[in-house]
Amino acid sequence: MGKMLSQVDVRTYWDFIEPGLREIKKEAKPEWRPEDIYSALASGIAELYVDIEQDPCESFIILQVKPSVFKPTQSLLIWVAYDKRENANGKYMEYIEHMAEQRGCNKVEFWTPWKGLADVLSHIGYETKQYIVEKEI
C-alpha cells in the first residue's frame, strides 16, 4: 500500500497548513477562507491528514465522509489536497482509497477547479462525472 497518512489535530498543525491553504486560496479562489477550514476541522466537520514522516510538514489532505443524497451510500470527499512535492497521487492515492473502503465509502470524490488534476486522476481510474456551472447574482 502507498505511504501512510495520519489524522492530526488542526490546533497542532495549523501553522504548517495555513500557508498552503493561503496559496490555494490565491490560485484557485475557492469560496472558503482558511479560517473556515480551521473551524470545520476544529468542530469535526472535516478531518486533517498529514504525512507525519515529512519534516517540515509540506503536504496535507482535508477530507470528509459525505452521505449520498439519493442512494444509501457515502463517499470520501477530498476538500483540499496539498503537496509541495511531485507525484502526491502516487504516494497517497492507494492509501486514501483503502481508507475510503475501510470507512464504508463506495467512492472517492475530488471537487477541483483544476482540469489538470482531473486529467491526472483520469489516468488512475477516476472520471469526471459532472461540471458545476454557476453565475453570481
Regions found by a protein language model. Give the residues of each.
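Short glycine-aromatic motifs
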Residues: 46, 123-127
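Conserved catalytic-core motifs of GNAT/GCN5-like acyltransferases
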Residues: 127-137
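Short, flexible, glycine/charge-rich loop motifs used to bind or transfer phosphoryl groups or to couple energy/partner
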Residues: 37-39, 66-69, 98
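Acyl-donor binding region in acyl/amide transferases
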Residues: 73-124
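Active-site rim helix/loop that mediates acceptor-substrate recognition in acyltransferases
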Residues: 27-48
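Conserved residues at the C-terminal ends of beta-strands
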Residues: 64, 111, 132
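Conserved donor-binding loop and adjoining core beta-sheet/short helix segment
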Residues: 43-86
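Short amphipathic alpha-helix that is part of the acyltransferase structural core
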Residues: 1-32
